[in-house]
């Protein structure tokens, strides 16, 4: 891949340059020292992937991500110091379409990256490379009702790039007494899930927490996949995690969860596929539709990255293709109709 580096610190730039070249599979397309410069360079030389810092002069990484995804969309990996202390910015950038985030590798005495932190970054780059091969970027292809103790309706949501903001928009539409059980599979490292849960909790009156082994979906509660393994139903209404299929590049996989819900959930399912790169979730959404469940895909105009919803639309997996602003109300309408 051709990779752009956006960072204002010379030592960090050199470290990232070495790591990009160390695999022998990638090249540094260009280096920008602030967000505005990156936006301008992308207009004339769009790389396959951008390694984007967050805190920079002139224009920060959040605003640069927003502008790049609006003007010349491409894959963006946030690489910055201390993600834990910048979670709000991380999720805002992901809401604009950044794929993932990782701490910049620590530097040893000799100025080299520590092996563990360097391996984490190169693994993420390799994973994104597989996603890009699976689905090119857009630029390259230029209700309110009483809660039930045992829910009959499962709201299964899948999302990837741009997902946090899209999920927040959907959840914010639900009333405090919403009766459906909600399970979210968002492509995100497990270490960031607690921060995502806290951030989403600011946008919904519903309780929200990471999904644990043997959890049961509860009416009016949001459970979020929180492992590098796949979230599945291991029995009727009981969740768990499994490493299989091990060769699935998407971890946790939306397809795996949707297919599991189609097999095990005893009531009705509303499958929702939001913005994201690649095709994950399309096949599972189709399986839900084939079993008579309501399925919804986000439309092109409101998707930060129109990959996963497009894949669903292409195979006829979605009963409804809706703008983000209409998805929450459509779910509420369907739930009220079934009461």
Curated annotation (Swiss-Prot):
Coiled coil: none annotated. Residues 149-338 form the CheB-type methylesterase domain. The keyword Phosphoprotein applies. Pfam families: CheB_methylest, Response_reg. GO terms for biological process: chemotaxis. It comes from the Bacteria. Its EC number is 3.1.1.61, 3.5.1.44. It is found in: Cytoplasm. It catalyses: [protein]-L-glutamate 5-O-methyl ester + H2O = L-glutamyl-[protein] + methanol + H(+); L-glutaminyl-[protein] + H2O = L-glutamyl-[protein] + NH4(+). Transmembrane segments: none annotated. InterPro entries: CheB-like, CheB_C, CheY-like_superfamily, Sig_transdc_resp-reg_Me-estase, Sig_transdc_resp-reg_receiver. Keywords: Chemotaxis, Cytoplasm, Hydrolase, Phosphoprotein, Plasmid. The active site is at 160, 187, 280. GO terms for molecular function: phosphorelay response regulator activity; protein-glutamate methylesterase activity; protein-glutamine glutaminase activity. Residues 2-119 form the Response regulatory domain. Involved in chemotaxis. Part of a chemotaxis signal transduction system that modulates chemotaxis in response to various stimuli. Catalyzes the demethylation of specific methylglutamate residues introduced into the chemoreceptors (methyl-accepting chemotaxis proteins or MCP) by CheR. Also mediates the irreversible deamidation of specific glutamine residues to glutamic acid. Belongs to the CheB family. Contains a C-terminal catalytic domain, and an N-terminal region which modulates catalytic activity. This is Protein-glutamate methylesterase/protein-glutamine glutaminase. It comes from Mesorhizobium japonicum (strain LMG 29417 / CECT 9101 / MAFF 303099) (Mesorhizobium loti (strain MAFF 303099)). The lineage of its organism: Bacteria, Pseudomonadati, Pseudomonadota, Alphaproteobacteria, Hyphomicrobiales.
């Amino acid at each position: 891949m051709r990779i752009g580096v956006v960072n204002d610190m010379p030592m960090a730039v050199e470290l990232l340059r070495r790591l990009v070249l160390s695999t022998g599979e990638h090249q540094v397309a260009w280096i920008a020292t602030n967000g505005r410069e990156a936006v301008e360079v992308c207009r004339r030389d769009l790389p396959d992937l951008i390694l984007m810092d967050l805190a920079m002069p002139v224009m920060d990484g959040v605003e640069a991500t927003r502008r790049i995804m609006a003007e010349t969309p491409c894959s963006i990996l946030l690489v910055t110091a201390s993600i834990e202390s910048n979670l709000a910015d991380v999720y805002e950038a992901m809401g604009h379409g950044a794929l993932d985030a990782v701490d910049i590798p620590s530097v040893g005495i000799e100025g080299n990256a520590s092996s563990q932190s360097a391996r984490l970054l190169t693994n993420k780059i390799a994973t994104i490379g597989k996603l890009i091969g699976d689905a090119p970027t857009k630029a390259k292809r230029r209700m309110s009702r009483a809660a039930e103790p045992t829910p009959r309706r499962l709201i299964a949501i899948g999302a990837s790039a741009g997902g946090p903001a899209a999920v927040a928009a959907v959840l914010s539409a639900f009333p405090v007494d919403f009766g459906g059980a909600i399970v979210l599979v968002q492509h995100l490292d497990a270490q960031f899930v607690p921060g995502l849960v806290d951030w989403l909790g600011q946008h919904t009156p519903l309780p929200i927490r990471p999904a644990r082994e043997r959890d049961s979906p509860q009416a009016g509660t949001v459970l979020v996949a929180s492992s590098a393994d796949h979230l599945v139903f291991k029995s009727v209404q009981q969740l768990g995690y499994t490493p299989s299929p091990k060769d699935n590049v998407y971890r946790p996989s939306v397809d795996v969860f949707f297919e599991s819900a189609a097999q095990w959930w005893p009531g009705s399912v509303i499958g929702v596929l939001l913005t994201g790169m690649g095709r994950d979730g399309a096949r599972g959404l189709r399986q839900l539709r084939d079993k008579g469940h309501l399925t919804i895909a986000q439309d092109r105009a409101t998707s930060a990255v129109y990959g996963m919803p497009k894949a669903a639309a292409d195979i006829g997996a979605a009963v409804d293709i809706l703008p983000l602003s209409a998805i929450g109300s459509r779910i509420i309408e369907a739930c009220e109709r079934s009461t």
